């Protein structure tokens, strides 16, 4: 009896040791296969390029770009402020140290030296082609010009709001705007936009799809054009593509780290395309026009009240994304 029990125990022990050995062998083999597979992927990954394809893609190309906060290397700074002004301001002031003077005045308002950046632009037309806003807070000074009301209004609409944009191939496709937030934005040295609305049979309504001269012209030789057409209707477009880039864009909402100060003019420019809404926005302000020194003094005096109507963010508007991002 005892011999049978010893034999059973010995058989069980041998089976256990054999199973343990087999499991260890399997684990070692799997480790070898996995590590070898990862090594092959690591070696081949620099030489492999993949592309995702989709159908009916939504509007996804952003005009915003993430950027490293310019104050990160300076621990004593908490925020940056960019003040954009036209060239004529510097020309009128004609003082090589005027920026240093303003920096000292901003310091007295709580903005440390080095946290305020002065950005010059040639004129509204030039700024419309390539607006770039990089600071935590951005304040744009625009001198009122009756002949440039439309340019000022569209520039304000562009920089005071966030947009998602996709390229448009107007030679192959018809396009329609889905709702009031959907616009076509054109930028370039000269943008002339013509449209031909289509019926359900894709025949032109009041125009011939084969003759661009019969299209309705809705923008002529503009630097920046935000086009709004009848929603839900297909349109054939004719655009001066040699000097202009057009994108299908959707307005997401306010870009709250940007404010515009209109210098002069009787009323603040209306930037709202929808006639049923109140045009005024807290970040669209106006100061009286006297001299540029007076304008800058006013900005310094009210800078903290202006900032209180804004929200800090670490994203920037870079119009280069408008031209190149898909």
Swiss-Prot record:
Signal peptide extent: 1-50
Maturation and modification: N-glycosylated. The N-terminus is blocked possibly by pyroglutamic acid.
Region annotated GPR motif, chain positions: 253-255
Segments of this protein annotated with the region CNP motif: 165-167
Annotated region described as LVD motif, given as residue ranges: 237-239
Glycosylation sites: 69
Family designation: Belongs to the rotavirus VP7 family.
Anything else known: Some rotavirus strains are neuraminidase-sensitive and require sialic acid to attach to the cell surface. Some rotavirus strains are integrin-dependent. Some rotavirus strains depend on ganglioside for their entry into the host cell. Hsp70 also seems to be involved in the entry of some strains. In group A rotaviruses, VP7 defines the G serotype.
Function: Calcium-binding protein that interacts with rotavirus cell receptors once the initial attachment by VP4 has been achieved. Rotavirus attachment and entry into the host cell probably involves multiple sequential contacts between the outer capsid proteins VP4 and VP7, and the cell receptors. Following entry into the host cell, low intracellular or intravesicular Ca(2+) concentration probably causes the calcium-stabilized VP7 trimers to dissociate from the virion. This step is probably necessary for the membrane-disrupting entry step and the release of VP4, which is locked onto the virion by VP7.
Record protein name field: Outer capsid glycoprotein VP7
